[in-house]
């Protein structure tokens, strides 16, 4: 089959580095992917052309961070415009999907909330979580934690711009010269290294977002919240646990980058030449459905990692903590069953659809108004 007709995702995103979540995301994912875990931003690497100078990079999530989009190599005004417009696009997509994201986080972490006495009884499902949250906290509470999630985009993009050239030179394998597996391993390594480097700086924002989103009004504690806002999360966590409290779950998050990245791009490169043939090659719907299927599949496969890292985050400030990600994994499976690792996965799938739909519409609006598309963070 003619390789020029079916370029790999890395060829399409030539010159771009890949950073991680939530995890997240995002994954686009959106974004640890998948993050969400990495679901939200993953679709955009299929939907957005690179002729406009915008690539895609894995960022934790939210989901795990999902996926964030990096401006191409440019300086001055061009970079600033792409940077700011990408921020607007990220704010639009993240804010639109924020209610689903909060429900996902509440369902995913409800067992830790019950242990801490901050949730009276388990949620029965997505609709029950929506209804109880609105009833107990009000409609605006569905956006709790969204500010930290939107703010996270900007340092992520700046770090992406700073790290991408270094890791591009360090892991500069060519598929034609070095072979597929060496090229694939190099891309996994570069994505993991760049993702971990970026994550080191923005992880505390994802931590703050997670704690705020899971800060339901506690029935057993007089309806009081644990945190009064993002700054309060930092102050209370540092006071009780020190800086390390802001980075609980960091190691497993870095593993999640590589796992999601390998699944996503491995599936993409394998399925694209088989599925997108003939008339489907330029079909928006076909690309959308393929991207959605791949991000959902990779996101579900890596979702337990996102659950473990977020459950570890939830123990900062608590008397009993997990000693490691392996202990967290084994205790969750032993005490709650393996299905507990997938709590909130249904909401994560809905978030992927909502985020992708909003971004597709926003891309069209940008083309009409500004004559070009700008990238966004999907995580």
Swiss-Prot record:
The keyword Transmembrane applies. It is found in: Mitochondrion inner membrane. Residues 309-314 are annotated as: Important for transport activity. Solcar repeats lie at residues 77-170, 182-274, 282-368. The keyword tRNA-binding does not apply. Pfam families: Mito_carr. GO terms for cellular component: chloroplast envelope; membrane; mitochondrial inner membrane; mitochondrion; plasma membrane. Disulfide bonds: none annotated. It is a multi-pass membrane protein. It comes from the Eukaryota. ADP:ATP antiporter that mediates import of ADP into the mitochondrial matrix for ATP synthesis, and export of ATP out to fuel the cell. Cycles between the cytoplasmic-open state (c-state) and the matrix-open state (m-state): operates by the alternating access mechanism with a single substrate-binding site intermittently exposed to either the cytosolic (c-state) or matrix (m-state) side of the inner mitochondrial membrane. The transmembrane helices are not perpendicular to the plane of the membrane, but cross the membrane at an angle. At least 2 of the odd-numbered transmembrane helices exhibit a sharp kink, due to the presence of a conserved proline residue. This is ADP,ATP carrier protein 3, mitochondrial.
């Amino acid at each position: 089959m003619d390789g020029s007709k079916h370029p790999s995702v890395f060829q399409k995103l030539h010159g771009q580095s890949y950073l991680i979540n939530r995890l997240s995301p995002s994954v686009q994912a959106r974004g640890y992917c998948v993050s969400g875990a990495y679901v939200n931003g993953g679709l955009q690497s299929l939907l957005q052309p690179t002729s406009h100078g915008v690539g895609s990079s894995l960022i934790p999530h939210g989901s795990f961070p999902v996926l964030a989009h990096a401006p191409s190599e440019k300086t001055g005004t061009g970079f600033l415009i792409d940077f700011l417009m990408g921020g607007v696009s990220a704010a639009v997509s993240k804010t639109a999907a924020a209610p689903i994201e909060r429900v996902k986080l509440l369902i995913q972490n409800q067992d830790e909330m019950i242990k801490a006495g901050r949730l009276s009884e388990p949620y029965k499902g997505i609709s029950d979580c929506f209804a109880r949250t609105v009833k107990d906290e009000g409609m605006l509470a569905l956006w709790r934690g969204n500010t930290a999630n939107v703010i996270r985009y900007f340092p992520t993009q700046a770090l992406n711009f700073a790290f991408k050239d270094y890791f591009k030179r360090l892991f500069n394998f060519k598929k034609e010269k070095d072979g597929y597996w060496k090229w694939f391993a190099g891309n996994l390594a570069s994505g993991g290294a760049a993702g971990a480097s970026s994550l080191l700086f923005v992880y505390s924002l994802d931590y703050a977002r997670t704690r705020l989103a899971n800060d339901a009004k506690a029935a057993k504690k007089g309806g009081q919240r644990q945190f009064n806002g993002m700054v309060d999360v930092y102050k209370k966590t540092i006071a009780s646990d020190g800086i390390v409290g802001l980075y609980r779950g960091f190691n497993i998050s870095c593993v999640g980058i590589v796992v999601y990245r390998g699944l996503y791009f491995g599936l993409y490169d394998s399925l694209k030449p088989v599925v997108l043939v003939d008339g489907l090659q330029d079909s928006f719907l076909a690309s959308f459905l393929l991207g959605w299927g791949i991000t959902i599949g990779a996101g579900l496969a890596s979702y337990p990692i996102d659950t473990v890292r977020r459950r570890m985050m939830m123990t900062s400030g608590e008397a009993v903590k997990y000693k490691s990600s392996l202990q967290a994994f084994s205790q969750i499976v032993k005490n709650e069953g393996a299905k507990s690792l997938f709590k909130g996965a249904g909401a994560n799938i809905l978030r992927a659809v909502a985020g992708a739909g909003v971004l597709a519409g926003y891309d069209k609006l940008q083309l009409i108004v500004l004559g070009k598309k700008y990238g966004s963070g999907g995580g």
